[in-house]
């Protein structure tokens, strides 16, 4: 069994004829998010996918097998929801609520696409959006720092968080040498002369001497 262990960077230009002759590996989105996978090429050949951790494959990516042969990635048709709305505000609200749930979304012209989910379909309908179930390739937006399928409970979430923290530090953090020198000299000189002349007799007459008139 051949092993596929490299992805050619998108900015590397390959001869169109060379890529066209390469066998195709057609995968649904969920499978394209896995760096370790037993898969079958469209030719029927079984292969092992062993890519760097956190790799998310996209339609059109070109991979390299251990024998140097090329393999082309294609996004499979799968069950999706097409989300449209009567106005921009409703579509924006839909996108906000989906993002709040860390839902992978493909953004189109006046349309959002996401993996089929009846619960989300109901939520979006309640927001005023129009939902259509379809069978189509799904290629959601990548994360702002290069990720794809990342949630708070995923191991790869830590990678995005670390990158985000690095960007923040570069712009606002350690490199700016903010010497905040928080020396709070609280010389409040609290002279609380309460004159608590507590005559703890039977009547406990508290002579506090606060001068409250």
UniProtKB/Swiss-Prot annotation:
Family indicated by similarity: Belongs to the UreE family.
Organism: Burkholderia thailandensis (strain ATCC 700388 / DSM 13276 / CCUG 48851 / CIP 106301 / E264)
Highest classification ranks of the organism: Bacteria, Pseudomonadati, Pseudomonadota, Betaproteobacteria, Burkholderiales
GO terms of biological process kind: protein folding; protein-containing complex assembly; urea metabolic process
Described purpose of this protein according to its UniProt entry: Involved in urease metallocenter assembly. Binds nickel. Probably functions as a nickel donor during metallocenter assembly.
Annotated InterPro entries: UreE (IPR012406), UreE_C_dom (IPR007864), UreE_N (IPR004029), UreE_N_sf (IPR036118)
Alphabetized UniProt keyword annotations: Chaperone, Cytoplasm, Nickel, Nickel insertion
Biased composition (Basic and acidic residues): 182-200
Gene Ontology CC, one term: cytoplasm
Cell compartment(s), UniProt: Cytoplasm
GO function terms (MF aspect): nickel cation binding; unfolded protein binding
Protein name, UniProt field: Urease accessory protein UreE
UniProt region (Disordered), positions on chain: 170-213
Keyword rRNA-binding carried by entry: no
């Amino acid at each position: 069994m051949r092993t596929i262990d490299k992805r050619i960077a998108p900015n590397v230009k390959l001869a169109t004829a060379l890529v066209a002759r390469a066998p195709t590996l057609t995968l649904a989105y969920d499978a394209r998010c896995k760096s370790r996978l037993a898969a079958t090429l469209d030719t029927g050949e079984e292969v092992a996918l062993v890519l760097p951790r956190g790799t998310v494959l996209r339609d059109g990516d070109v991979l390299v097998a251990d024998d140097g042969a090329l393999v082309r990635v294609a996004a499979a048709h799968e069950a999706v929801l097409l989300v449209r709305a009567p106005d921009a505000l409703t579509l924006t609200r839909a996108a906000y609520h989906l993002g709040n749930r860390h839902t992978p979304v493909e953004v189109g012209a006046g349309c959002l696409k996401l993996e089929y989910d009846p619960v989300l379909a109901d939520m979006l309908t309640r927001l005023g959006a129009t939902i259509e179930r379809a069978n189509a390739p799904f290629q959601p937006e990548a994360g702002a720092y290069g990720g794809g399928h990342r949630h708070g409970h995923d191991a790869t979430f830590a990678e995005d968080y670390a990158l985000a923290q690095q960007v923040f530090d570069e712009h606002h953090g350690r490199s700016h040498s903010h010497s905040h020198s928080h020396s709070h000299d609280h010389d409040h000189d609290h002279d609380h002369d309460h004159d608590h002349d507590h005559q703890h007799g039977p009547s406990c007459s508290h002579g506090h001497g606060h001068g409250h008139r």
